[in-house]
Amino acid sequence: MSTFRDWKVVNKLSDRGQTNSEVHLLQKKDSDEFIVRKVIHGIDHPLYQAIFTREMRALYKLNKSENIVSIVGDDYLKETKTGEKVGVIYLEYINGVELGKVQIENLSSKEKFSIVRQLLDAIEISHSNGIIHRDINPNNIMVTEDKVVKVIDFGICKINDMINSATVFTLGTNAYSAPEVHQHSENATEKSDLYSIGAVIYYLFTGKQPPLAVQFQKTMDSVRGMDIELKPIVKKLVAENPDDRYENIFELRKDISRLFMRFLDTEKTVVFTMAYERFKELKNFKLLPQSVTV
């Protein structure tokens, strides 16, 4: 694409993985502007063609979401030396780090719940557009210095109106993947993403990698330090049987909204009445926050 010829590679961000893609950081000549270039190799092969097309289509659909990486262009190129056809996706540069590299123990409860809410915002928009991410994990969640969340890597997403038999490979299976995805990646539904969200929340609030799905409920029973209202929500998210999980992300939001109100909506003013003597008594015993006034 001619508009990106004035950009030079300044760093290699990742080598080829299971999606056969490389990621580079580009800088515009004589400028402080940066973008990211993702090159998917071997797109003559149906699998990698599907990966390229899916990610490109998904990102264009979701391009207005604040919490999903933005696409700024795409191209088909041919390698000069090998003649290999490659697909290229140009993305916004996110000045941040993967959630997996964040010092979890240094995050406050408010910051953790903010990350969760932004993640839900991103996946809600994705699901509303018929897109299942299929690979939600801490390495695909970027966090900026200002704690803004950006979900990345839609390379193995499932688009409901795009069924392709070429993707009969097992992709994206890790400790954050739902058990049905481990059996076959095309088994993924919205509930599979919800399982992954639950696994991410578990990691965020414990600092530990999630256990196997078959052990998750027992592990959750012995978890310490997690908010008493959050625990049953996570348990439902990571149920081994998809039928036992939340029906959709809207149902999840309904349950978790009270926690968001407690930890995030702290600037709201609440007015209530009580006898003044009772009020003084509660304040004396420190049963009301000092911010509560007459």
Describe each model-derived feature in a short phrase.
Residues 44-61:
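AlphaC helix of the eukaryotic protein kinase fold
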Residues 167-181:
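Conserved activation segment of eukaryotic-like protein kinases, specifically the C-terminal portion
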Residues 127-143:
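Catalytic-loop of the protein kinase fold
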Residues 82-98:
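Conserved short submotifs of the Hanks-type protein kinase catalytic core
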Residues 70-87:
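Short beta-strand micro-motifs within the conserved protein kinase catalytic domain, predominantly
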Residues 264-294:
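Regulatory extensions appended to serine/threonine kinase catalytic cores
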Residues 115-116:
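Activation segment signature within eukaryotic-like protein kinase domains
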